[in-house]
Amino acid sequence: KFAKELKSDRYNIPTYRTVLKADSEDNYALLPITVNPDGLSPDSIYMIPLRIKSISNYEINPDKQQVLYQVVLKNEYATMESTTHYQTAGTEIKHTTIGEKANGSNVTRVVAPISKNRVRVFVGTHTYTPGKVTKEDIDKYGMYLTINDDKSITITPCGSLQVEMIGGAEDNYYEVDKKGRQIFYLHYKYFDTNVTVTDDKNTWTEDCWITMEEKGIRSL
């Protein structure tokens, strides 16, 4: 996995001057950097290359003259500093050719920040390992959760996925409970391929719609 240099039009550094005080307990100084995260992928590593051009009074250590500043995507609901997981439990209903097949579902869901009020998750019981997810997987299984001002959630596909919300704000919303836990409540259906179906005698696969009703709690 390779890092990418963040294009200069995606960030702003108002001043390149900083002061490291002689009596400071810290051995570093800070620069203000503003980044526009819209359109950046949570699956990529972005770097801003910086170099000390000149200093006063002292000589520059050539071994410590350059730094790669890593941009970490983060919002209120997830961060890429470390992988964010929501422990999700609920009901899965497969709408098969032999009728509805209901099962309980439990999945540790990866939640990735996309913008200030949007995250990306995979539908159903599908999941992935950060750093190994493919564009094809995202296109097939990825959906966006947009958290609106009233804390209702709008569900949209990342790519070719067929997904539909069920109900309204009373079924799809975000809250922080009395214990301070962050929770997503979701109710939706999506179309999946090669779904395993079993009856009393046989097991086979078919394409069908699957309805999910779930509650996801952010793991600490």
Regions found by a protein language model. Give the residues of each.
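Short, contiguous acidic and Ser/Thr-rich linear segments
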Residues: 20-25
